[in-house]
Amino acid sequence: MKNISILGSTGSIGTQTLDVVRNHPEKFKIVALSASGNIDAIENQIHEFHPEIVAVFHREKAEILSARIGKKVKVVSGIEGLIEVATLDSADIVVTSVVGSIGLIPTVEAIRCGKTIALANKETLVVAGELIKKEAEKHKVQIIPVDSEHSAIFQCLQGEDIHNISRIILTASGGAFRNWEKQDIQHAKAQDALKHPTWNMGSKVTIDSASLMNKGLEVMEARWLFNVELDKIDVIVHPQSIVHSMVEYNDFSIIAQIGAPDMRGPIQYALSYPNRINSSIERLDFRKISALTFMAPDTDKFPCLSLAYESLKIGKTMPCVLNGANEVLVEYFLEDRIGFYDIPKFIEKAMSAHKPWVYTDIEELLEVDRWVRNWIKEQIE
């Protein structure tokens, strides 16, 4: 039996993690949950899974939840509450499925407590990849990726020598605007971008998918997860989302991980690793697949991918700037306050306005994150 803490249990990855646990009660037990402010959803989760502790980020919502459930479970709030969930003594695995850089500090604290990390919060490695890897090595902690692409690569690397990698090939669905003309994308609204063709994801990730920023962030994540240089990481658009990613070795043979586009697959693999257990997801039937297609990403239509590569090449604090700017701009786009192409436009401006430096601790990164968020708000408001 593995004890699971979930950071972000009411979001897309969190609820699908609970579905995996629900299907395997003999293998997994929930000991801690957290949410931003959806107390109705987390109250239902409390009644079903009986955790020891629950964190609600917004203090007022936490107080309301505590009044509702009485002394059934300890309720905490704020970043301190997320840290309590991440470092709970009884937890074996911490699923980091919160969205954005808010996941950074709890993830670091979980690593320092020796917890296995099932990483779904890609921003943690985007912002502080080098620091996270050092902490994981220092505390002998394993980071198991939950993103479908990185889970695929992780699986393709099993039993292989990482030094024999020729390149990593990340697949991208192409997002909601894959077949749109650039002039039409200019006038797109949030509801258009949220119509993802293959995956069921949260709103922020779905917008990032439409801009290809999600793939850019995944390139940065792969750089640190697998210790592979940037020039060995390629992106290819694969609309069917059946080949989840591939690894090419120095003999030019390619190993791919293939399966139905269902996030419960990589989630379950991360929880059960190194074992494989029976799954309830759809079984892939090759007789029903007419074609698997691949194409190069269009970085003219989707400049966010190039910006992500550029920020990683520059390194230092620049990835933190790119990430923080993108998070704020996606919020503005979801609120219909800016256009779709304002996202890369203002990210590029923020990168130009920033003079990157070599950071030594998390507080410096948080300072950069605060700076870029305020800078973006000043430019737009």
UniProtKB/Swiss-Prot annotation:
One of its GO terms (molecular function) is NADPH binding. It catalyses: 2-C-methyl-D-erythritol 4-phosphate + NADP(+) = 1-deoxy-D-xylulose 5-phosphate + NADPH + H(+). Its cofactor is Mg(2+); Mn(2+). One of its GO terms (biological process) is isopentenyl diphosphate biosynthetic process, methylerythritol 4-phosphate pathway involved in terpenoid biosynthetic process. Keywords: Isoprene biosynthesis, Manganese, Metal-binding, NADP, Oxidoreductase. It is an enzyme of class 1 (oxidoreductase). NADPH binds at T10, G11, S12, I13, N38, N121, E123, G202. Its EC number is 1.1.1.267. InterPro entries: DXP_reductoisomerase, DXP_reductoisomerase_C, DXP_reductoisomerase_N, DXPR_C, DXPR_C_sf, NAD(P)-bd_dom_sf. Pfam families: DXP_redisom_C, DXP_reductoisom, DXPR_C. The keyword Oxidoreductase applies. Signal peptide: none annotated. Mn(2+) binds at D147, E149, E218. 1-deoxy-D-xylulose 5-phosphate binds at K122, S148, E149, S173, H196, S209, N214, K215, E218. Pathway: Isoprenoid biosynthesis; isopentenyl diphosphate biosynthesis via DXP pathway; isopentenyl diphosphate from 1-deoxy-D-xylulose 5-phosphate: step 1/6. PANTHER family: 1-DEOXY-D-XYLULOSE 5-PHOSPHATE REDUCTOISOMERASE, 1-DEOXY-D-XYLULOSE 5-PHOSPHATE REDUCTOISOMERASE, CHLOROPLASTIC. Catalyzes the NADPH-dependent rearrangement and reduction of 1-deoxy-D-xylulose-5-phosphate (DXP) to 2-C-methyl-D-erythritol 4-phosphate (MEP). Belongs to the DXR family. NCBIfam families: Dxr, PRK12464.1. This is 1-deoxy-D-xylulose 5-phosphate reductoisomerase. The gene is dxr.
